[in-house]
Amino acid sequence: MAKNVVITGATSGIGEAIARAYLEQGENVVLTGRRIDRLETLKSEFAETFPNQTVWTFPLDVTDMIMVKTVCSDILETIAQIDILVNNAGLALGLAPYQDYEELDMLTMLDTNVKGLMAVTRCFLPAMVKANQ
């Protein structure tokens, strides 16, 4: 039986590659990301390439805590069980040495790379623990 894999930051790069790898293994994927156009493009592409797997898409900005809760709830209502969570969303801003980083860039990276992913984990974890995942 195919597993259901939720992937944050799935619209490009590593997230897209992870989604493709799970689909190649016969798993179903839930693609999340900020770029709605990319989510729809990937859904169409993956549906054509992997017709036996299911691909769901949900727009998600992990820095928006209300959106995280809403989307998590929507995903759990749509999909019977989440087997795997790949918290891939992240970003890197600026190329300056650390001491020269802009404070806003650091805060944005913390909001995305730490707080956002913690919020996503916290949202899905109870259902995954209940299902022994």
Where are the regions a protein language model picked out?
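Active-site loop of short-chain dehydrogenase/reductase
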Residues: 3, 81-82, 129-133
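Substrate-binding pocket helix/loop in short-chain dehydrogenase/reductase
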Residues: 96-98, 102-110
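Conserved glycine-rich Rossmann-like NAD(P)H-binding loop of the short-chain dehydrogenase/reductase
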Residues: 25-41
